[in-house]
Amino acid sequence: MTVPDTGFMLRSLEYLASFIIILFALMVLAIIVVYIMDVTQTKQAIRRNYPVIGHFRYFFEDIGKFFRQYFFAMDREEMPFNRAERSWVYRAAKDLDNTTAFGSSRALSPPGTILFVNCPFPTLGEDAAETQPVTIGSFCKQPYTAKSLFNVSGMSFGALSKPAVQALSAGAAKGGCWVNTGEGGLSPYHLEGDADIVFQIGTAKYGVRDEAGKLSDDKLREVAAHPQVKMFEIKMSQGAKPGKGGILPGGKVTEEIAQIRGIPAGEDSISPNRHPDINSLGDLLDMIDRIRTVTGKPVGFKAVIGAYGWLDELCTEINKRGPKSAPDFITIDSADGGTGAAPMSLMDYMGLPVKESLPLVADTLTKHGLKERIKLIASGKLITPAEVAWALCVGADFIVSARGFMFALGCIQALHCNKNNCPTGITTHDKRLQKGLVPTVKAERVADYIKNLNYEVGVIAHSCGVKEPRQLRRFHARMVAENGQSVGLDELYAAKTAPASVSSLKVS
């Protein structure tokens, strides 16, 4: 029988005991050092009054948002998007069954709640019609006929990672919708998916600027020469930060992004808070005419509605100049729209939400006889079928979403878009994190999200008794008022009588 080497075992225990003692001593020393640092520093009162343990306050504050999201928040409590909304998009993007059981968890009595009016004789499946395409820019040399009523809103390469842009581009092509470049310029990754593209011109004019930073006609022609580029959008303001230019932190300005934008790498990319060369409504119409003349393609603008007297002035000026001078479309962004980075003071308090601004703009265009000439695009937290159907009822011709498609890519609402450490690889340029986002897989999810959203918007339309979603009108929906009773949207937003239509006017 072999006798155990007790000497080796004893030595091992001695080493282990010594290691534990040294480790304990180092921990005590570290606590003493932290204690001294805390009581001598003057910047933070908690650490000075409660040395050492005061650090736990910051730790718990940081992880608290994750506990709230995963353990404590109810399905319809979170902001900006609750779990019910996110889950619908996740399942739609994965092409999974999106039915639920037992009953709705949505409260139907709070003021502002939207209710659709079902028809006693809903549209039969065999009577349903395909969503009709709509032509934008009938006065242009190259008008654009858009098939999908739901499309990808502006998100720039820079704010988004390379694989995210690749997935969106390929998915949009499969889903039959357009993708907006955002204000960061046209990247090769926007083009490689072969989707229809809306090129956005921001206040810094990235991608179409000359050496002095001004709009270049030659650069416009270069961009317009790509057959995938169908329209141009002048970004006047953004929902999350009206009056503030785009912000891309220097950590996200790589050499490639800097080259596309024409700026130094590694430095913060901060756009002017408005277009320096657009000082009036006349300047805006002149800029639209200039870009349309140079490119031959539809041109519109994106804006958050706040001071709304200018809308009547704009329409009056358009009618004075003639319908050809009008923007081919207007994108209405909501005050609760998304962003990669914005001051909280603007994000929380500036501008009107789309539920107020969209009917206002639609009515203003109708009043001036321009609703058929100028197509309306709604944007801002419209990520589910009900929200899209509401926008169609109120007067939108198209709906665009950014964060809805981010959820389709796998976004978990970590709220780290501005920190370059997005855990899903969508808004980071960290290669290690980007590898989690496989463009070919996520492109399928983008396409499935488009397919399933359009399908369920159709389900709502058929329940309302119309053959396709574009036939939805204000009388098909109601809104709960303060007294708990619902009011028809046709009563709440009484549409103005339209003067003579300009739809019959053709390019001469």
Where are the language model's segments positioned?
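Conserved, well-structured core domains of diverse proteins
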Residues: 2-150, 154-178, 184-194, 199-240, ...
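Carboxylate/His-rich catalytic cores and anion/metal-binding grooves
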Residues: 176, 226-249, 308, 313-328, ...
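Flexible, glycine/charged-enriched surface loops at secondary-structure junctions
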Residues: 182-184, 297-302, 327, 371, ...
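Glycine-rich tight-turn/loop motif centered on a GG-T
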Residues: 199, 205-207, 250-278, 340-355, ...
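Phosphate/diphosphate-binding loops
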Residues: 209-236, 353, 362-363, 374, ...
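Mobile "lid/hinge" segments at catalytic clefts and subdomain interfaces of large enzymes
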Residues: 226-261, 413-432, 457
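Glycine-rich phosphate/ribose-binding loops and adjacent secondary-structure elements
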Residues: 270-434
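Active-site or pore-adjacent capping/gating segments
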Residues: 411-474
